[in-house]
């Protein structure tokens, strides 16, 4: 399915980590970090957390690109010129996004427990801590697609074939997560359809009541 609007989201019982860039050489990461791309990823993650994971008001932590999140410009300008503006715009759209945080201290202090998801700038920044914590039970989920796609968080591990050493846990969790997301999407679709219409109420009038039943009668 050829869709540019997706997020590689690693999911476990302890954390969810999304990536701005995925399989790129480290030397090319910076040129792919833009305000528009970060904002797009935040929108997708926020929507996915609501419809796929049943989190009503998700909180998303955003990492910086440089060590110490740029250290106020001493170690890079991407945080101030690109990442922070994307976070500000996301907040204007109602997305609870906070940061940018330095990745090392964020995981070291267990701040990840305070957030529903994390947006990392590049592959190893997000996946090394994720796999250290959840290698055998993590799931690779593609957020933003119209269908559910999951896979084990680890690679194929062909060297373990026929050795009776491979763990099925991540594969099993991928199946369970796919079922849970399918169920959550059905529930989200049900509660989101036929929303109440918006009414303009003039607060200067004495009678501010709205005849909801009359509006409903017009719809049938």
Where are the language model's segments positioned?
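Anion-binding alpha/beta catalytic cores of soluble intermediary-metabolism enzymes, centered on
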Residues: 1-78, 84, 88-220
